């Protein structure tokens, strides 16, 4: 094996070999249990970020673990067409390169442009996924707009429409005036903002008066421009100030519309003036009030968010109505919405109707992609009736057919599902699944899979002109079908039979409603088992937290704290990293701050660590459902782990290759250390499997680290040295056999988390074991063997380790050179301790560097020594001749003085009121921790001074 571990030399060639050999495919053995994970399809526009790397490491670990258990294993891969995101990327590209808009191209040519762009750039993310070692079946890769998935989408739409579970309605939606499309509640970002509350007088009609004799009501609003669309004023029915006015009318300023005063609990007596203007076409709460009181709806805005030339007037059901005039005063027509706000306020003021303006804190909705203020807009949209679909989906989680890990996410799921709103599924975009609905010139709607089908089913001749709906479906509509559409539905395929329901879904909690809930609803409606019972899409949902930076901040381009997972694999120089973080910024003014922070954090850029170290770190940080603060030090630690495993394997190979390791017969004698490591290994296998089976990847990673680093490398390899240098033939054979057997088993154990290094080493080790198989990927996963857990060997070795560590600690405390042989005395020994010394003298002498071991009678005072108590004996190391008493006392006095200086410095800091008041809690806690550490170190040094003074 190469002397040094260089991941960059082994990882890519190995992955190409695995893929070429077809190791990622299901084994096709239907007699075996199947195991299937559907990858959450990343956006085709995207590139790999830490969230992907985290989730995909978890998925690949599960897939490799199950594959090694012989299961028929499928990891289904694919990408999402990502409607808005992709359309925006391509629109920006043609604007920058050609100065054109999509309208210059026209719909068909623009869509061709997107397909062309996908062909050029769409492969970035899948190339990056290969770098992570993902063992997905690439031959089954799907795209949410490919032909099969498009057919599934049409099939679902048509069936739901025919069951009256999809309908078209005029409803209020979140409208993005920049992107000119409806967006979902989940794509709206609410931002806190300082604004104003305008108090405006609405004159009462027909000579009516308020309880205190005024001939007007004062209405408070944060959006005066929408006055033009008011159709009512609400007061609380319990409010004594206005009770007598319910059923009367006001005259709306500026447009002179006569609108009713209604009694509704939406009006809060304690807030503002207690009178609320009702604009059903431009506010979600007002829309509900309008429905309760049958108020008309007046839309005053264009899709760009400008004031219309004439309003659209509808009744409560959304039918066109002439109950009010559609006239809008000329001075407001075509004004941009925020300019209209100023103009309306000025006009109201000129009429003497502006009572006052108060500063007001408010929450403003922004589109998370377009970045502009969202308008509630009355539009014709397509909806799914969600309550019918939600019922079985709630029951599936209630009765345990689907389990969330961790369980607390079930509550989040229930709270949304039990109060579910109809789902708006249409989007005013060009890129996506076009809605399979056609209209004739009379406005009749026909739904079908194709235009031909529509004509046939409805007996429409070629002379009837039909035009297809311009809108596309919400991206999440096709994603909701992901678990079954990828397996060939609506055909009844073998893949669907073998792999559905799937086993586990790994997802971030942020898309539990967007995606998880909708998959459960859609799957249970369309997929039934042989008994007609609805099938769930998956049995377990494993929820991950978010990966944050080392300070707990969310990673984002605008903060400049994003770390590309592949930069940790391959390394990146500081100039390249700075370019990545500060180039093409939406907010260039942040660049300097980001540059300083990056230079401080990564003065030399990022070293290459390799994929395995990255995967190990991600697994180790995966505590269920919690957000993770990324830690570069942990990454370095796991890179060192890979190095340690590599070097340990070289040691094993150097001592076993071309040697008799007992695989072809011959007598074998196992030493205490051999029996101990086999027992430790089996206990590790049991605990590790339990951790993986319960999705505790963090615990599994910890178990693997502890066994490999501490037991196998630090102890067992050392304990083999006495046998290697002086053992009999059968003892040598036994130890070599154990070295190779445990290493080979350990490689299989670690393979799901760190696949590259384990395969590389295993290819060398398998030759010694006489294994002829091609790859570790398809080897059986280690199983717990209780017969190999030798309790006596475990107890004896733990005692030996205790004794060796005690001697090593004395060396360190007394500043004795590690190589200097020592005399060891044991006093007050139990019979068990005497037996352990006599049986394992060579281990003790070699590992503790002892020239002699003497057992003293219990009452023997012995020479002046440093002592340690261990189980069943007192250890003494005589000090005479080992150290120069005066020099050592002087050294210790110097150490004590240095520590006292540090203690005084920190105590001074902590007694400074200014520091304590200003410094963050974490900084103060760190200083206190340091203080405790120094106090402990000082106590130890004083103890040593006492021992040496007595010599």
From Swiss-Prot:
Q: Could you tell me which PANTHER family the record lists for this protein? A: VALINE--TRNA LIGASE, CHLOROPLASTIC_MITOCHONDRIAL 2, VALYL-TRNA SYNTHETASES
- Its family? Belongs to the class-I aminoacyl-tRNA synthetase family. ValS type 1 subfamily.
Q: Which GO terms describe its molecular function?
A: aminoacyl-tRNA deacylase activity; ATP binding; valine-tRNA ligase activity
Location within or outside the cell: Cytoplasm
Q: What is its main location?
A: cytoplasm
The UniProt entry annotates the motif 'HIGH' region at 42-52
EC primary class: ligase
Instruction: Show the coiled coil region(s).
Output: 882-944
- Cross-referenced InterPro entries, in alphabetical order? aa-tRNA-synth_I_CS (IPR001412), aa-tRNA-synth_Ia (IPR002300), Anticodon_Ia_Val (IPR033705), M/V/L/I-tRNA-synth_anticd-bd (IPR013155), Rossmann-like_a/b/a_fold (IPR014729), tRNA-bd_arm (IPR010978), tRNAsynth_Ia_anticodon-bd (IPR009080), Val-tRNA_synth_C_sf (IPR037118)
**Recorded catalytic activity of this chain's protein:** tRNA(Val) + L-valine + ATP = L-valyl-tRNA(Val) + AMP + diphosphate
Q: What is its EC number?
A: 6.1.1.9
- Record HAMAP family: Val_tRNA_synth_type1
Provide the Gene Ontology terms for cellular component: cytosol
Positions contributing to ATP binding: 557
- Please state what the protein is called: Valine--tRNA ligase
Species of the source: Salmonella typhimurium (strain LT2 / SGSC1412 / ATCC 700720)
Keyword field: Aminoacyl-tRNA synthetase, ATP-binding, Coiled coil, Cytoplasm, Ligase, Nucleotide-binding, Protein biosynthesis
Note whether ATP-binding occurs among the keywords.
yes
Keyword Repeat recorded: no
Outline what the protein does.
Catalyzes the attachment of valine to tRNA(Val). As ValRS can inadvertently accommodate and process structurally similar amino acids such as threonine, to avoid such errors, it has a 'posttransfer' editing activity that hydrolyzes mischarged Thr-tRNA(Val) in a tRNA-dependent manner.
Q: Where is this motif: 'KMSKS' region?
A: 554-558
Q: Which GO terms describe its biological process?
A: valyl-tRNA aminoacylation
Domain notes from UniProt = ValRS has two distinct active sites: one for aminoacylation and one for editing. The misactivated threonine is translocated from the active site to the editing site.
């Amino acid at each position: 094996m190469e002397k040094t571990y260089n991941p960059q030399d082994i990882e890519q060639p190995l992955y190409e070999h695995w893929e070429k050999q077809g190791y990622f495919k299901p084994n096709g053995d239907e007699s075996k249990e199947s195991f299937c994970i559907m990858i959450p399809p990343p956006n085709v526009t995207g590139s790999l970020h830490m969230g992907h790397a985290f989730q995909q490491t978890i998925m690949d670990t599960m897939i490799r673990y199950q594959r090694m258990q012989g299961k028929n294993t499928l990891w289904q891969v694919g990408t999402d067409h990502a409607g808005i995101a992709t359309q925006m990327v391509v629109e920006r590209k043609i604007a920058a390169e050609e100065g054109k808009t999509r309208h210059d191209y026209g719909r068909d040519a623009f869509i061709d442009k997107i397909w062309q762009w996908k062909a050029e750039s769409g492969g970035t993310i899948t190339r990056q996924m290969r770098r992570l070692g993902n063992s997905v079946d690439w031959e089954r890769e799907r795209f949410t707009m490919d032909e099969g998935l498009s057919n599934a989408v049409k099939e679902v739409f048509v069936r739901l429409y025919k069951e009256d579970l999809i309908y078209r309605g005029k409803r209020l939606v979140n409208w993005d005036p920049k992107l000119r499309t409806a967006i979902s509640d989940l794509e709206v970002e609410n931002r806190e903002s300082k604004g104003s509350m305008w108090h405006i007088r609405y004159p009462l009609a027909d000579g009516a008066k308020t309880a205190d004799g005024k001939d007007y009501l004062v209405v408070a609003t944060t959006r005066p421009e929408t006055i033009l669309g008011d159709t009512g004023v609400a007061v609380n029915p319990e409010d004594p100030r206005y009770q007598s006015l319910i059923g009367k009318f006001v005259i709306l300023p500026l447009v002179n519309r006569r609108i009713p005063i209604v009694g509704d609990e939406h009006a809060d007596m304690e807030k503002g003036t207690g009178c609320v203007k009702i604009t059903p076409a431009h506010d979600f709460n007002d829309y509900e009030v309008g429905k309760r009181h049958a108020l008309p709806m007046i839309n005053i805005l264009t899709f760009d968010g400008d004031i219309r030339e004439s309003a659209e007037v509808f009744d409560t059901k959304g039918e066109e109505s002439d109950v009010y005039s559609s006239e809008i005063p000329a001075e407001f027509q075509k004004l941009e919405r925020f300019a209209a706000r100023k103009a309306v306020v000025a006009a109201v003021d000129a009429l003497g109707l502006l009572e006052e303006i108060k500063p007001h804190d408010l929450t403003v909705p922004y589109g998370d992609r377009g970045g502009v203020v969202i308008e509630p807009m009355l539009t014709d949209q397509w909806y799914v009736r969600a309550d019918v679909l939600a019922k079985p989906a709630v029951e599936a989680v209630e009765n345990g057919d689907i389990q969330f890990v961790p369980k607390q996410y079930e509550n989040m799921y229930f709270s949304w599902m039990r109060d579910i709103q109809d789902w708006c599924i249409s989007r005013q975009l060009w890129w996506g699944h076009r809605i399979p609905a056609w209209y004739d010139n009379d406005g009749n709607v026909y739904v079908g899979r194709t235009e031909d089908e529509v004509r046939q089913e409805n007996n429409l001749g070629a002379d009837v002109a039909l035009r297809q709906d311009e809108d596309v479906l919400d991206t999440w509509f096709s994603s909701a079908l992901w678990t079954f559409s990828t397996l060939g539905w609506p055909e009844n395929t073998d893949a669907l039979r073998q792999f559905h329901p799937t086993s586990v879904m790994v997802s971030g909690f942020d898309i539990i409603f967007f995606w998880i809930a909708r998959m459960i609803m859609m799957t249970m409606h369309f997929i039934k088992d042989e008994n007609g019972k609805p099938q769930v899409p998956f049995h377990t949902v494993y929820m991950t937290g978010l990966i944050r930076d080392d300070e707990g901040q969310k990673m984002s381009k605008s903060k400049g704290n994003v770390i590309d997972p592949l930069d940790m694999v391959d390394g990146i120089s500081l100039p390249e990293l700075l370019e990545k973080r500060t180039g093409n910024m939406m907010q260039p003014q942040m660049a300097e701050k980001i540059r300083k922070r990056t230079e401080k954090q990564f003065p030399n850029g990022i070293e290459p660590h390799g994929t395995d170290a990255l995967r190990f770190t991600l697994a180790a940080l995966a505590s269920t459902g919690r957000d993770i603060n990324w830690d570069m030090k942990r990454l370095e630690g796991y890179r060192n782990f890979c190095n340690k495993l590599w070097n340990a394997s070289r040691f094993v190979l150097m001592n076993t290759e071309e040697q008799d390791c007992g695989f072809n017969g011959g007598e074998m004698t196992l030493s205490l250390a051999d029996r101990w490591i086999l027992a430790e290994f089996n206990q590790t296998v049991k605990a590790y499997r339990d951790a993986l089976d319960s999705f505790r990847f963090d615990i599994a990673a910890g178990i693997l680290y502890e066994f490999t680093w501490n037991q196998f490398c630090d102890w067992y390899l050392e304990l083999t040295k006495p046998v290697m240098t002086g053992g009999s033939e059968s003892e040598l054979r036994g130890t070599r056999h154990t070295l190779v057997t445990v290493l080979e088993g350990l490689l299989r154990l670690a393979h799901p988390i760190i696949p590259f290094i384990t395969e590389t080493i295993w290819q060398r080790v398998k030759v010694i074991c006489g294994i002829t198989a091609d790859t570790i990927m398809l080897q059986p996963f280690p199983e717990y063997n209780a017969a190999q857990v030798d309790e006596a060997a475990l107890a004896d070795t733990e005692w030996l380790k205790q004794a060796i560590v005690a001697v090593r600690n004395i060396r360190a405390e007394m500043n004795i050179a590690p190589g200097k042989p020592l005399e060891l005395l044991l006093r007050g020994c139990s019979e068990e301790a005497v037996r352990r010394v006599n049986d394992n003298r060579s281990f003790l002498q070699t590992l503790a560097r002892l020239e002699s071991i003497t057992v003293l009678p219990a009452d023997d005072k012995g020479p002046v020594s440093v002592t340690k108590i261990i189980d069943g004996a007192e250890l003494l190391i005589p000090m005479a001749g080992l150290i120069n008493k005066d020099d050592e006392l002087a050294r210790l006095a110097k150490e004590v003085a240095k520590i006292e200086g540090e203690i005084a410095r920190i105590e001074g800091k902590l007694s400074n009121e200014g520091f304590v008041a200003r410094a963050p809690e974490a900084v103060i806690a760190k200083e206190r921790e340091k203080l405790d550490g120094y106090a402990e170190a000082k106590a130890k040094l004083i103890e040593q001074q006492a021992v040496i003074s007595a010599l």
